C-alpha cells in the first residue's frame, strides 16, 4: 500500500512538472515575437529652394511577425567624430513633412502583416523665407505594442528603423565648402615618431567642416620612403555634416584596428618615411594638404641578435673554462 501511494505521488509530481514546462514553453514561444523591418532608400540627400517641395517614395517591408508601426520624423545631430548621430525627440528647423498616402499619416499607428510592404509617400516642403543651410532628419518606423483587452500593452520586442534625410536649403543651389585638416598625426609609443620596422604604423586624419553645408572628401594619402618608393591609399568618401568633425579612413580600411585610426600601415619599414595627404571635395573645390614623417628601425631584431650573441659568447667561454 505504501509503495502504491509513493508511486501515485511520483506520478502526480511528474504531471505537474510536465504541465508547468509545457505552459512555460508555450508562453515563451508566444512572447518571443520576431521583428524584422527594412526601409529603402536608407539615405536621401537633396537641395531644395525656399517655396518648393519634393515627394519621396519609401518602401517599408516587414519580414517578421505582424506588427503595429508608427512613422514619424525627427531631427538628428552629430554625436562624435566617428560618424555616429544623436536622434532628437522631434523635428526641428523650417522643413515641413507630411504623408501623401490616403489612409496613412505621420505619428498615426498602422498595421503591417508578415511579408507585407507599405509605400510611404513623404512630402518634404520648404516654406518661403526659410534660412539657407543644412537640416538633418530621420524618418523613423517604430513598432507600437498592441493594447490588450484590459488596456495593458502586450510584451513584445521594440524595434525602430530609420532612413536619414539630408536637406540643403539654398536659393542658388550653391554649396559652401570650408574644410580644414585639424589632425594628421602618427600614434607612436615613443616621444619621437620612431617605430620598430615590424610594428604597425597607425595614422589619424580628422577633418573639420567649418561651412553650413555637408561635404564629402576625396583624395589619397601617399607614403614615400627610401629610393623613391611610394604607395597610395585612397580616402573612403563619407559625408561630414555641417560644422562638425569626422575621422576619415583610407583603404585598406582601418576598421579592424583596436583603436580609432584612419590608416594602419604594416610591413617592413627601414629608414625615414614621409606621409602626405591630398584631399579635395569634388569639381572646382579647394584642395587641402598635410604631411608628417617617421623613422623606422628593427630595434627588436637587433636586440634579439645582440642577446643571442651575448648568450653564445657566454656559453662558449663557460665550456672553454670547464675544459681548462
Segments (PLM) and residue ranges:
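Short proline/glycine- and polar residue-rich coil/turn motifs
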Residues: 48-50, 109-118, 236-247
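Short beta-strand elements of extracellular/lumenal beta-sandwich folds
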Residues: 50-65, 197-210
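Membrane-proximal extracellular "stem/stalk" segments
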Residues: 171-303
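N-terminal edge beta-strand
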Residues: 33-54, 180-197
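Short acidic, flexible loop segments centered on an aromatic residue
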Residues: 65-94, 208-228
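Ligand-binding face of N-terminal immunoglobulin V-set domains in extracellular IgSF glycoproteins
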Residues: 55-59, 67-74, 95-153
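Short beta-strand and strand-turn-strand segments in soluble, beta-rich domains
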Residues: 36-40, 84-108, 223-236, 287
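Short, basic, low-complexity termini and linkers enriched in Ser/Thr/Gly/Pro
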Residues: 1-32
Amino acid at each position: 500500500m505504501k509503495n502504491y501511494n509513493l508511486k501515485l505521488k511520483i506520478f502526480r509530481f511528474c504531471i505537474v512538472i510536465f504541465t508547468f514546462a509545457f505552459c512555460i514553453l508555450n508562453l515563451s514561444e508566444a512572447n518571443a515575437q520576431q521583428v524584422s523591418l527594412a526601409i529603402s532608400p536608407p539615405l536621401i540627400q537633396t537641395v531644395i529652394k525656399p517655396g518648393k517641395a519634393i515627394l519621396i517614395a519609401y518602401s517599408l517591408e516587414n519580414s517578421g511577425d505582424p506588427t503595429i508601426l508608427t512613422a514619424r520624423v525627427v531631427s538628428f545631430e552629430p554625436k562624435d567624430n566617428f560618424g555616429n548621430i544623436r536622434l532628437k525627440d522631434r523635428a526641428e528647423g523650417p522643413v515641413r513633412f507630411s504623408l501623401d498616402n490616403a489612409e496613412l499619416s505621420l505619428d498615426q499607428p498602422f498595421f503591417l502583416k508578415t511579408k507585407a510592404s507599405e509605400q510611404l509617400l513623404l512630402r518634404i516642403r520648404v516654406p518661403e523665407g526659410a534660412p539657407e543651410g543644412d537640416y538633418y532628419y530621420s524618418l523613423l518606423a517604430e513598432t507600437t505594442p498592441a493594447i490588450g483587452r484590459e488596456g495593458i500593452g502586450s510584451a513584445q520586442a521594440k524595434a525602430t528603423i530609420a532612413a536619414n534625410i539630408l536637406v540643403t536649403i539654398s536659393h542658388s543651389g550653391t554649396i559652401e565648402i570650408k574644410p580644414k585638416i585639424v589632425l594628421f598625426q602618427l600614434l607612436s609609443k615613443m616621444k619621437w615618431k620612431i617605430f620598430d620596422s615590424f610594428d604597425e604604423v597607425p595614422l589619424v586624419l580628422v577633418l573639420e567642416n567649418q561651412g553650413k553645408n555637408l561635404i564629402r572628401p576625396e583624395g589619397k594619402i601617399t607614403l614615400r620612403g627610401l629610393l623613391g618608393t611610394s604607395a597610395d591609399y585612397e580616402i573612403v568618401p563619407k559625408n561630414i555634416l555641417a560644422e562638425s568633425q569626422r575621422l576619415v579612413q583610407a583603404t585598406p580600411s582601418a576598421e579592424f584596428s583596436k583603436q580609432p585610426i584612419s590608416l594602419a600601415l604594416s610591413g617592413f619599414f627601414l629608414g625615414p618615411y614621409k606621409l602626405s595627404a591630398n584631399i579635395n571635395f569634388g569639381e572646382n573645390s579647394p584642395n587641402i594638404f598635410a604631411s608628417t614623417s617617421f623613422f623606422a628601425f628593427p630595434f627588436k631584431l637587433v636586440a634579439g641578435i645582440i642577446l643571442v650573441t651575448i648568450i653564445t659568447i657566454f656559453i662558449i667561454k663557460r665550456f672553454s673554462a670547464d675544459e681548462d
